[in-house]
């Protein structure tokens, strides 16, 4: 058995903007992963979108060699993880490949709900969590208060948390020294049959599927025939290697290491994330416990603007699904928008990111319908069905009970802003479960309807608390609610893509707001366009987009009134005929207006 004591696998847990990507850059710089010229800010956030929004979306991995003060050279395999609530599954995947995690906390802001949630995930998976206080060079840093928060809120010892500043590079070497000392080396047997976990896969147009793997036992080298356990297919390995952060091929990957494998897999679903790889000569190696499949929380229809793009859209989705295990989709057709897909997302940020990636990376023009959550319906005949699309809602006479998903929201907020946050939660039909005062922060738990949370709760929470509140939520149960379907009719015709499922108490208000919003967005036609919101057969709100009309009396100078009346009647008849055959073009903004209806 070869010695694995020089390997350390770790990931970084941090809230958005607490500086984990910058810390990663310092690690790469100190260990000489890239030359000065190649060093760019946020090296690992390689997607343009990640840089623009300043967030990490995908997990990335880097292998670095660090010469410690004890004279040994350690191999550090570091997996960068996202910090946003929508991407928690990326985090759990990264953690499954590590023995330890750095909990990076901004010394000025203190602990945030997101880090708490990810930290618990790490502790549940048995990882060694090592606290690091970042941004110590800022004047508002309060290390003692933050250490106390870490101990209070998360419950891990923070007396000897390392203080550093990733931006200036101060104390980063201390972090590395401490890391080598605290985080345990991996366990594994190089001589045993190969057993490797796929952490991530993505599709490269030239190489096929590239998989990021963590080898548990055995070794894998170029030319080996590997077996994908879940599909039973065998592939020949073309190359193995590590990211330093550049692609660099190595002779082999051994137990305890993290690196990439390219095996010329052309089928997009050939190497599913969370799967186990082994050699074809030892097919009976056990599957490694993968990751639980995560259920999408929010569904929306995406339709290509021109129907010719449908096939390209399908292909783009397949490639994205490979890289993003949480994405689920099925074909859907709409009378108003033609053919497209109903796609399941983890949250609104995830939905925006995916839409932007489809439009940028695959050059598609898409229309998105309003996102909805999954409702549970109990029918009169005793069946239970789940509906994620308002247009698929059965007739109300068949429904015994409608239940909406409830989430438990865990909110951390400074005491000064507590009142505003509670007001917001009550407005969103929340029920308070628990409140704890932790130093200057308050931890509040609320049960909230998921439909209220996914739309704009996060943005509203940030604005009422001046950006200080942080949120983490998880699905708890389905609960009976008085829900109705709100249809939008344009010129008396239902537009299926604009339907919403809303709570009866808010239905009139939402209907009014929606019709007002649509009135601003639908361009004026040559005839009046009536926009109505209806619940069943009852119209609850209506607005009219007034017609454009030509002044037909311009050519009459004075003269008899009957002459003018004749011209006006003629115009009226023409408009009436036009209205019977005319169709109304609905712009993309109108579909998005449904999202922006303030609750």
UniProtKB/Swiss-Prot annotation:
CDD domains, per database record: EF4_II, EF4_III, LepA, lepA_C
Entry's family note: Belongs to the TRAFAC class translation factor GTPase superfamily. Classic translation factor GTPase family. LepA subfamily.
Gene Ontology molecular function, alphabetical: GTP binding; GTPase activity; guanosine tetraphosphate binding; ribosome binding; translation elongation factor activity
Binding-site residues for GTP, renumbered to this chain: 17-22, 134-137
Catalyzed reactions: GTP + H2O = GDP + phosphate + H(+)
NCBIfam families for this protein: lepA (TIGR01393), small_GTP (TIGR00231)
EC number(s) stated in the UniProt entry for this protein: 3.6.5.n1
Pfam family membership, one: GTP_EFTU
InterPro entries in the cross-refs: EF-4, EFG_III/V, EFG_V-like, EFTu-like_2, LepA_C_sf, LepA_CTD, LepA_IV, P-loop_NTPase
Encoding gene, per UniProt annotation: lepA
Gene Ontology, cellular component aspect: plasma membrane
Annotated tr-type G domain residues: 5-187
Superkingdom field: Bacteria
Any one GO biological process: positive regulation of translation
Protein's recorded name: Elongation factor 4
Subcellular location: Cell inner membrane
Bilayer topology term: Peripheral membrane protein
Membrane-spanning segments: none
Biological role: Required for accurate and efficient protein synthesis under certain stress conditions. May act as a fidelity factor of the translation reaction, by catalyzing a one-codon backward translocation of tRNAs on improperly translocated ribosomes. Back-translocation proceeds from a post-translocation (POST) complex to a pre-translocation (PRE) complex, thus giving elongation factor G a second chance to translocate the tRNAs correctly. Binds to ribosomes in a GTP-dependent manner.
Classification via PANTHER family: TRANSLATION FACTOR GUF1 HOMOLOG, CHLOROPLASTIC (PTHR43512:SF4), TRANSLATION FACTOR GUF1-RELATED (PTHR43512)
Keywords: Cell inner membrane, Cell membrane, GTP-binding, Hydrolase, Membrane, Nucleotide-binding, Protein biosynthesis
Keyword Membrane found: yes
């Amino acid at each position: 058995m070869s010695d694995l004591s020089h390997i350390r696998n770790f990931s970084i847990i941090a809230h958005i903007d607490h500086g984990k990507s910058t810390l990663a850059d310092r690690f790469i710089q100190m260990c000489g992963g890239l030359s000065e010229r190649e060093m760019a800010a946020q090296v690992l956030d390689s997607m343009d979108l990640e840089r623009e929004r300043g967030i990490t979306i995908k997990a990335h991995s880097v292998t670095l060699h660090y010469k410690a003060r004890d004279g040994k050279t350690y191999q550090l395999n570091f997996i960068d993880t996202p910090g946003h609530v929508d991407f928690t599954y990326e985090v759990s995947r990264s953690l499954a490949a590590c023995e330890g995690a750095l909990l990076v906390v901004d010394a000025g802001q203190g602990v945030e709900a997101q880090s708490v949630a990810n930290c618990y995930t790490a502790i549940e998976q048995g990882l060694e969590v090592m606290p690091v206080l970042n941004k110590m060079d800022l004047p508002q840093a309060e290390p003692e208060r933050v250490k106390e928060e870490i101990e209070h809120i998360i419950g891990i010892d923070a007396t000897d948390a390392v203080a550093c500043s990733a931006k200036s590079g101060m104390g980063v070497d201390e972090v590395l020294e401490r890391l080598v000392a605290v985080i345990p080396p991996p366990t594994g047997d190089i001589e045993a049959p190969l057993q490797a976990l796929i952490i991530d896969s993505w599709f490269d147009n030239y190489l096929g599927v590239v998989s990021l793997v963590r080898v548990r036992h055995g070794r894998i080298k170029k030319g080996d025939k590997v077996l994908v356990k879940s599909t039973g297919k065998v592939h020949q390995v073309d190359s193995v290697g590590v990211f330093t952060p550049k692609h660099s091929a190595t002779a082999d990957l051994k137990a305890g290491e993290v690196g990439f494998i390219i095996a010329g897999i052309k089928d997009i679903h050939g190497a599913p994330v969370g799967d186990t790889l082994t050699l074809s000569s030892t097919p009976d190696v056990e599957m490694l416990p993968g990751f639980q499949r995560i259920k999408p929380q929010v569904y929306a229809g995406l339709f290509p603007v021109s129907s010719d793009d449908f096939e390209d859209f399908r292909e783009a989705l397949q490639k994205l699904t490979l890289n993003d295990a949480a994405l689920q989709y099925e074909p859907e057709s709409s009378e108003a928008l033609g053919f497209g897909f109903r796609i399941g997302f983890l949250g609104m940020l995830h939905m925006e990111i995916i839409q932007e990636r489809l439009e940028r990376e695959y050059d598609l023009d898409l229309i998105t319908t309003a996102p909805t959550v999954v409702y549970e319906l109990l029918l009169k005949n005793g069946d239970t069905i789940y509906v994620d699309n308002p247009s698929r809602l059965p007739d109300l006479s068949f429904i015994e009970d409608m239940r909406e998903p409830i989430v438990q929201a865990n909110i951390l907020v400074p005491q000064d802003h507590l009142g505003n946050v509670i007001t917001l939660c009550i407005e969103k039909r929340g029920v308070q479960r628990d409140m704890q005062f932790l130093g200057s922060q308050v931890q509040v738990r609320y049960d909230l309807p998921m439909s209220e949370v996914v739309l704009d709760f996060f943005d509203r929470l940030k604005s009422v608390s001046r950006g200080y509140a942080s949120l983490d939520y998880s699905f708890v149960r389905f609960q009976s609610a008085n829900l109705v379907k709100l249809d939008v009719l344009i010129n008396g015709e239902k537009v299926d893509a604009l339907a919403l499922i809303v709570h009866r108490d808010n239905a009139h208000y939402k209907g009014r707001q929606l019709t007002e919003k649509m009135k601003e967005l639908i361009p004026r036609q040559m005839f009046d366009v009536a926009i109505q919101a209806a619940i069943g057969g009852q119209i609850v709100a209506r607005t009219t987009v007034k017609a454009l009309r030509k002044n037909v009396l311009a050519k009459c100078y004075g003269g008899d009134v009957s002459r003018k009346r004749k011209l006006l009647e003629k115009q009226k008849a023409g408009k009436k005929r036009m209205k019977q055959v005319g169709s109304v073009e609905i712009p993309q903004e109108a579909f998005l207006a449904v999202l922006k209806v303030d609750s």
